[in-house]
A protein has these predicted regions:
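Phosphate/diphosphate ligand-binding glycine-rich loop within oxidoreductases
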Residues: 71-154
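Short hydrophobic/charged patches on amphipathic alpha-helices used for structural packing
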Residues: 64-67, 85, 167
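Short loop/turn and capping residues at structural boundaries
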Residues: 35, 123, 162-163
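A short, basic/flexible loop-to-alpha-helix module at the beginning of a structural domain
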Residues: 158-174
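Residues that mark the start of a beta-strand
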Residues: 4-5, 172-176
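N-terminal glycine-/charge-rich "phosphate-binding" loop or analogous flexible N-terminal tail
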Residues: 1-75
Length: 184
């Protein structure tokens, strides 16, 4: 009997991307792809991500279809789908939970630890995007881009901002970071 991997796909990591784990079949695994929430639209997906952040994995619903495949699963691969205590308890043979993101707030870590299940994440996955955003946000703040945009949209035209005394001379800028972005 093949060992089962349950790969739960969503709008962020879709079925085609998850299908790439079929390379593990040569090691005796059977890959089962299941959708986190059937026909989830973009707004529902965003709300689900917010729910994971606010309510945790046990307070965020997931398709009941997922539970059909958990009984003999040794590995669960997920992106943003919650892996609740109920899911972990349903997966009697579970050894590994892998999330394709840096954060692990979508996984009930306490339940995984109690069962001795290894949890694997993808540290640094968003490091380049975070670094890009950080530099862009700094420029936006220094040059008053968001303030000016909002001001113009509401009929204003501010000429002098509170940071004007130093925003014109940004020759010296130091970035200190502790993330994996430096490695990329």
């Amino acid at each position: 009997m093949a060992k089962r991997i349950v790969a739960i796909y969503d709008r962020g990591i879709d079925k085609n991307l998850m299908q790439g784990f079929d390379v593990l079949e040569k090691y005796g695994y059977e890959l089962t792809l299941v959708e986190k929430t059937v026909n989830e639209d973009e707004l529902a997906y965003q709300n689900s991500m917010l729910s994971v952040e606010v309510n945790g994995p046990d307070g965020t619903p997931i398709s009941e279809e997922v539970f059909q495949y958990l009984d003999d699963a040794e590995i669960i691969i997920t992106h943003f789908a919650p892996v609740s205590r109920r899911m972990i308890e349903a997966a009697k043979n579970l050894k590994i939970i892998a999330t394709l993101r840096t954060g692990m707030e979508n996984i009930n870590m306490e339940a995984a630890k109690e069962r001795g299940i290894k949890v694997i994440n993808a540290p640094g996955r968003a490091a380049v995007a975070v670094a890009d955003f950080t530099v862009a946000a700094m420029l936006c703040e220094i040059r008053n881009i968001a303030r000016t945009d909002e001001d113009i949209k509401t009929g204003g035209w501010t000429k002098k901002y509170p940071n004007r005394t130093y925003s014109d001379n940004m020759c010296n800028l130091c970035l200190l970071y502790t993330s994996d972005a430096a490695d990329d």
